[in-house]
A protein has these predicted regions:
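Blade-edge motifs of beta-propeller repeat domains
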Residues: 1-6, 39-64, 97-123, 156-195, ...
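Solenoidal tandem-repeat scaffolds enriched in leucines and small polar residues
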Residues: 6-12, 28-29, 86-87
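Beta-propeller blade termini
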Residues: 9-16, 67-74, 126-133, 198-205, ...
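Acidic/hydrophobic-patterned starts of short beta strands in beta-sheet-rich repeat architectures
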Residues: 18-27, 76-85, 135-144, 207-216, ...
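Loop/turn residues immediately N-terminal
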Residues: 31-32, 89-90, 148-149, 220-221, ...
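Conserved blade-register residue in beta-propeller folds
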Residues: 35-37, 93-95, 152-154, 224-226, ...
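Loop/turn-rich, solvent-exposed surfaces of beta-rich toroidal or solenoidal domains
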Residues: 293, 347-380
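Blade-level signature of beta-propeller repeat domains, shared across WD40, Kelch, NHL, RCC1
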Residues: 401-440
Length: 440
């Protein structure tokens, strides 16, 4: 049995084939279920080689990873069904039909349960960006998650405590967006092949007047989805690479096995690509960690032919009391220097979720970074196009992160004092008040 299941078997026991002795069905680390027929007896069990549980549609696969089945005759028909949990907390019913075909019990394909309205949730490791997507004057939530999806969560009511619509998935060519690692896209190996870890920002990237979505993922590729408009606002064009006018080959993290296409931007995985007009020239720039973990500014420009490109990233951000940051301990190097938000390699790289907002009300953009909740770096000086930040610590004492949170600024009170909305590992969204005395 050890060699038949792709890790984390989570076995459940029942007489699945109706022959009077208990059999096994195991979950796994990825997305499948494995059937082990008991060819022995109840008192002396002996199991045939495992086979992927399948039905007339093919192998039964769940939506995400880390599959945990339990036995329950959920519909009371006398046959043992499976109730199966995924990594992101969703639960599916896999109904036993009561039939056996070629020695295998026949189950229907998974049907995921839904529930009545409750606190807003979007999968696991949710990554919100607050933005008025539908143009009705209320900040909505555009979010990614560990499954590699992107959702529109509409603000229905406005006001200080909004009422929210259920998450609706963005689509390309009629199919929900689903960025996944596949067999070789994760730097932590093929066991992560169904994860995508989308993290994003929203801006009018092509200047057509509609907001677009700029995204990073498990791959570390910075891409963008063009907004096609339409009544529901969910239709996007296929992903396109963000273009950079490199002077040579496109750089990449040292541990990447694959080479970026010329003119594309590949950086550390799972880090926020902040699309904003940083220099106030009317073009949308990009701020993101570079391939070595330094916070970098990619300035937008227009070529003589009219094409919009990014210049190679420049390290214009400095830390006055924290030149190297760690999301668990905070300051990893207290000396002054260029701001490096992660010096980890391989699987310890990237993961930084960032945003900019005037947190203390002094008229300068401060930097917010993921931590056990979120921390902030105060903008203390701007000189010759460069910025110096002072590390100020966490904005709250509440612990929300096992891996990372994802902050985005909100102003639901409408008083121009920013608060934070944090996406957390549990997929829920948490509101953090601003305790800073505003300089305004």
């Amino acid at each position: 049995i050890r060699d038949s299941v792709y890790g984390a078997p989570n076995p459940c026991i029942a007489d699945f084939d109706g022959d009077g002795d208990p059999d096994l069905i195991c979950g796994e680390f990825v997305d499948g279920l494995t059937w082990f027929e008991n060819v022995g007896t109840r008192t002396e069990p002996r199991f045939a080689a495992g086979r992927p549980l399948a039905n007339k549609h093919g192998e039964i696969r769940l939506h995400l990873e880390m599959i945990v089945p339990v036995v329950s005759d959920f519909d009371g028909d006398g046959h043992p069904d499976l109730i199966v949990g995924d990594e992101d907390g969703r639960v599916a019913w896999v109904r036993h039909t009561g039939k056996v075909k070629k020695g295998m019990p026949q189950f229907e394909s998974p049907v995921y349960f839904t529930q009545q309205a409750d606190p807003v949730k979007f999968g696991a490791l949710s990554t919100p960006c607050a933005f008025d997507w539908d143009g009705d004057g209320k900040q909505d939530i555009i979010a990614g998650n560990s499954a590699g999806e992107i959702a529109f969560i509409r603000n229905l009511s406005g006001g200080e405590n909004p009422v929210w619509d259920a998450p609706r998935l963005f689509t390309v060519n009629g199919r929900p967006i689903r960025i996944q690692a596949g067999e070789n896209g994760s730097i932590q190996g093929p066991a992560e092949r169904k994860w995508g870890y989308t993290v994003l920002s929203v801006a009018d990237w092509d200047g057509d007047g509609l907001p677009d979505i700029i995204v990073n993922s498990i791959w570390g590729k910075i891409e963008w989805f063009r907004n096609l408009g339409g009544k529901d606002g969910l239709r996007l064009a296929p992903a396109q690479p963000v273009r950079v006018a490199w002077e040579g080959e496109a750089p990449k993290p040292a541990w990447n096995w694959w080479t970026p296409e010329p003119g594309t931007l590949v950086t550390q995985w799972r880090t926020t690509p902040v699309a904003m007009d940083w220099n106030g020239d009317g073009l949308t720039d990009l701020i993101v960690l570079d391939q070595e973990g330094y916070l970098a500014y990619y300035e937008r420009f227009r070529t003589p032919e009219g094409e919009l490109l990014l210049r190679p990233g420049r390290r214009i951000f400095h830390g006055t009391n924290c030149s190297l940051y760690n999301s668990r301990s905070g300051v990893a190097d207290a000396s002054e220097g260029l701001l490096r938000l992660n010096d980890g390699i391989g699987g310890q790289s990237g993961r930084r979720k960032i945003c900019f907002t005037d947190w203390d009300g002094d008229g300068r953009l401060d930097l917010i970074v993921d931590s056990q909740n979120a921390c902030w770096f105060r903008n203390v000086r701007e000189e010759r196009g460069e910025v110096w930040y002072e590390y100020m610590g966490n904005v709250s004492e509440r612990i929300l992160a096992g891996h990372t949170t994802c902050p985005t600024p909100i102003d639901w009170r409408g008083d121009s004092t920013p608060e934070l909305l944090l996406g957390a590992e549990d997929g829920h969204f948490y509101r953090m008040a601003n305790q800073q005395k505003q300089a305004r």
